[in-house]
Amino acid sequence: MNKQDVMKLQTCVLKVNVHCEGCKHKVKKQLQKIEGVYSVKADVEQGRVTVTGNIDPALLVKKLSKSGKHAEILGGGGGGGGGGGKGFPNLNGQFANLNMGGNNKPKGGKESNQVKGKAGGGGGGGQNHGHGQPMQLNPQQIQQMMMMKAAHGGGGGGQMKMPPMAAKDQKKSVKFADDEDDEFSEDDYDDEDFSEDDYDDDEFDDDEDDDDEMGHGHGHGGGGGNHMPPNKMMMPNKMMPQMGGHHGNGGGPKGPNEIMMMMNGFKGGGGGGKKGGGGGFEIPVQMKGMGEGKNGKDGKKGKGGEKGKKEGKENKGGGKTGKTDAKSGGGGLLGFFKKGKSGNGDEKKSAGKKDGHGGNKVKSHGGGGGVQHYDSGPKKGGGGTKGGGHGGLDIDELMKHSKGGGGGGNKGNHNHSAKGIGGGPMGPGGPMGPGGPMGQGGPMGMMGPGGPMSMMGPGGPMGPMGGQGGSYPAVQGLPMSGGGGYYPGPPQASQQMNQQQYMQMMMNQQQQQQQQQQAVAHGGYGGGHGGDMYHPMMYARPYPAVNYAHPPPMPPPHSDSYTHMFSDENPGSCSIM
């Protein structure tokens, strides 16, 4: 076999009713006849036949059923060639789809959220949810792949390993919107894996909550939270777990707006969105004045916005939003607005399906925690939750016009990016995108410019640092000045840049003025008295009073010409130059 043939080989595992050596022999013979089959291995005990070659598994099944043997494709199918159980992708196609950057983001087909282990999904992206055996085909592994007995999902480039509970509720997530898959695939940032205690803060985490609430939230929103192994490469500076995952669009956001939350925000609670069962996306509001409101799980650490278990298990019952009795008086948003129990107390309007797209309105007031649950929990359209009020401030009115949190991106805030134009984590409608719950202009554009409550962004109605030049607030331990925040977003970036360049220009201008003035003062014009008429500009050094003698003029350049006469650097010494 030449190299190209090897590259085209696929392994397919068929479940065939093989009872004895005779059957086995017959099946082998049938399969060997098919063009493109390279080797056939039969396992009588398990009733499995492993076929290697450049063939279409559907063809194998067809041939076997003709000869009276019922066959099913177990693994290896799907992937290329359009999903389902059809056509093996050739490996080159897989390499294209594997996205070697380590994102585990199979591009190509819609991420198939099929519950059975039948690998679906196009372009090497079939995720065999049932068999959670990831298999990344590198060129070095091709030979091994040929030898493997049961290569589950030879085709699936990006099959993700899943915790056991993933498959049980997966049925709900078979709906997905096309546009989300390409750019922001939900696997990239899904944090379903945080139930594995990779990044949880153990003290705030109680596992019953996880177990009860996870599994209800898998990807019910716009695009189905597909699952991936904790992918540490994708974490900015490994500082924080992927935040969002479950809010419908999968994909915990990554980006300037949320990095602010890394240092403090995550004291509260567990790797992001994980506990917001039903795919809730909790944003710990407090950062600086963290007080006691640590968003603690069972109110263990002060009832920071989530008192005890969220009753209703995060709207398992649909319209009943999880009560987050945000009573805690501690903290206050960034220590700015301290208000123990907000006026509306625990007013939880269970606005169930009020928004028409199934958005819940969780008003968690309370200075202490104000955890906003962007629950696009079990609602299938990924409805955005109507941005409820946040801690301490009675901003219900402010929030009214930011309906439709970024949940599934289906009605992205402000941007109305209907149908999830950027349904992914950072797209216009996503949880962090320009219209999403925390993006620029989202209901709580926490750092983003222009949200109704954009705490820090320029121009928000309430932004304490609103207005020009206000950058993100400093993260704990950084200066709170204009450039203090991490990664200012583009709008601020431009202002910051302008400021800096402006400062730079001012400095240069001053230096030039200084030099000119010095030149003038040292006899530039009229020897003795020219300089005094030119008053120094901003910070130029003051000149002596008029009636004093001027300092001696600058010495002429190259007074000691011998030093340079034979130096390489003095072109004057050489007539040719």
UniProtKB/Swiss-Prot annotation:
Keywords noted in UniProt: Lipoprotein, Metal-binding, Methylation, Prenylation
Annotated region described as Disordered, given as residue ranges: 77-136, 150-451
GO molecular function, one term: metal ion binding
GO cellular component: plasmodesma
Biased composition (Acidic residues): 178-213
Keyword Metal-binding: yes
Matches recorded under InterPro entries: HMA_dom, HMA_dom_sf
Source superkingdom: Eukaryota
Propeptide: 575-577
Covalent lipidation (S-farnesyl cysteine), chain numbering: C574
The protein's name: Heavy metal-associated isoprenylated plant protein 34
